[in-house]
A protein has these predicted regions:
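N-terminal Rossmann NAD(P)H-binding glycine-rich loop of SDR-like oxidoreductase domains
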Residues: 66-94
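NAD(P)H-binding glycine-rich loop region in Rossmannoid oxidoreductase-like domains
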Residues: 83, 103-170
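Conserved Rossmann-fold NAD(P)-dependent oxidoreductase catalytic core, especially the SDR/UDP-sugar
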Residues: 149, 158-237, 261
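Conserved beta-loop-beta element that borders a ligand/cofactor-binding pocket
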Residues: 192, 244-272
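Glycine/proline-rich active-site loop of Rossmann-fold NAD(P)-dependent oxidoreductases
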Residues: 254-258, 270-287, 326-338
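Alpha-helical substrate-binding/gating segment
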Residues: 288-338
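Mid/C-terminal beta-alpha module of Rossmann-like enzyme folds, strongest
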Residues: 309, 321-378, 410-415, 419-421
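Conserved C-terminal active-site "lid" loop/helix of NAD(P)H-dependent oxidoreductases
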Residues: 316, 377-399
């Protein structure tokens, strides 16, 4: 009997030791997992975002959105591209949260509010937001299934190249933080730039979505590197666009609840919705200058840039539609990039060819600008670049495009209708 009791006691002791070892192992395992998760969290991340669980298991379940999934928010909604995005979404029946800096600025928002009175299936609601303020988009993004980020507070005209670069990161980080806090966003489509794509190549080289501005460093004589960001605005702007693209893709991958897709437009032209869209130094602005009889690159008899260039043109309405299709298409995935440029060679013109086309489309305008000519030929040879086409957007997103003739004609007609010529 005593031996039996001793065996029972021995078995219980062994069991307790086993349980203690198992508990110690489980505790160590969870501690290791916790430490691993903490190491992945980015420095300076908001406290409320630190505790938010990653859902990478959702990655295979993510697909495009539809209007039944909820509203779509548009940043930079009053801008040239953003306004067309809002219009396109409303045509498709979406409820749009239009984010603008000042909802009381009638000059910038009236054309948006007028969309509510055009019999479109969708609707629009304005939200006041500022890219440079943390949390400014939280309210606008609540309940949204998609975000189309067209807003940009910085460009070439900041005081220093470093401000261009740093500012681009700051504003995009604020927007991404609001996306994560919303918790309902499936697709985040944002306007990048062809500047994030282009780099020195031989004349006639055709750029694709596989190209990045940091490629072919030797072609820049080693200048186009991150070490030179603080010294050159062009480098700062292009590298900011490329590196924020990569930052956004990484943020979406780590979060696991939404996918990020970029649209990289080249020379965007097309009809203006408001005279506010005649933005100084924009491509549509220079079309207006040509129609006023000024050679390309000139403004009020001042030469702002060289008059020779290969124009690679895309309609602003096609750019807008590509943003919306990026939120919907099952073919687009996190990290997908889509160049929005000419559909084919017809949309690529040297300045003198563009002048000839405008003369054909607007015979009533006596003097149309172009570039300096000698005996009917361009005085200077133009470097044959950038060549690129929106083939991938057509193939994967199902984008259909305007003809270059329709785009140019309707651009000029809008300038006339708005009394800008």
């Amino acid at each position: 009997m005593a031996m039996f009791e001793n065996n029972i006691i021995w078995i219980l002791l062994v069991g307790l030791v086993g349980i203690w070892i198992s508990l110690d192992f489980i505790q160590a395992m969870f501690s290791s997992i916790k430490e691993g998760k903490e190491e992945k969290q980015e420095e300076g991340q908001e406290e409320e975002l630190e505790d938010r669980p990653s859902s990478n298991d959702n990655r295979d379940k993510l697909t495009g959105i539809s209007k039944s999934d909820g509203p779509v928010a548009v940043t930079g909604a009053s801008g040239y591209i953003g306004s067309r995005v809002v219009e396109d979404l409303m045509h498709q029946g979406y409820q749009v949260h239009a984010c603008v800096r000042d909802v009381s600025n009638e000059k910038k928002v009236d054309h948006l509010l007028n969309l509510n009175h055009q019999g479109l299936e969708g609707g629009i609601e304005l939200y006041e937001s500022d890219l440079l303020e943390k949390g400014s988009y939280d309210k606008a993004f609540e309940g949204c299934s998609g975000i189309i980020h067209c807003g940009a507070a910085l460009g070439f005209n900041r005081e220093t190249p470093q401000e261009v670069y740093d500012g681009c990161f700051t504003q995009n980080e604020h927007v991404i933080e609001s996306v994560k806090r919303a918790g309902t966003v499936k697709r985040f489509v944002f306007t990048s730039s062809f500047a994030a794509v282009g780099h020195p190549r031989p004349e006639g080289y055709v750029f694709t979505e596989k190209d990045w501005c940091g490629d072919n460093v030797e072609g820049y004589g080693g200048a186009w590197t991150e070490e030179n960001i603080s010294k050159n605005r062009d480098i700062a702007y292009a590298m900011a666009k490329a590196n924020t693209e990569k930052m956004i893709y990484k943020a979406a991958e780590e979060d696991g609840n939404f996918e990020a897709i970029s649209i990289n437009p080249l020379h965007v032209i097309g009809p203006l919705m408001s005279d506010n869209h005649n933005q100084f130094f924009s491509w549509q602005f220079f079309i207006g200058q040509l129609l006023k009889g000024l050679d390309f690159g000139y403004w009020k008899e001042r030469q702002l840039r060289g008059s020779t260039m290969l124009w690679n043109m895309v309609d602003v309405r096609d750019v807008a539609r590509a943003h919306r299709l990026g939120t919907e298409s099952p073919n687009a995935k996190n990290g997908s990039r889509y160049i929005l440029s000419a559909t084919d060679r017809s949309g690529e013109m040297f300045t003198w060819e563009l002048q000839a086309k405008l003369k054909e489309l607007f015979p009533e305008i006596e003097n149309i600008g172009g570039e300096e000519m000698e005996e009917g030929k361009p005085k200077e040879k133009t470097y044959d670049s950038p060549r690129s086409y929106c083939s991938l957007a057509i193939e994967e997103l199902g984008l259909s495009t305007y003809s270059i003739e329709d785009t140019l004609k309707e651009t000029g007609d809008s300038y006339k209708a708005l009394n800008l010529l």
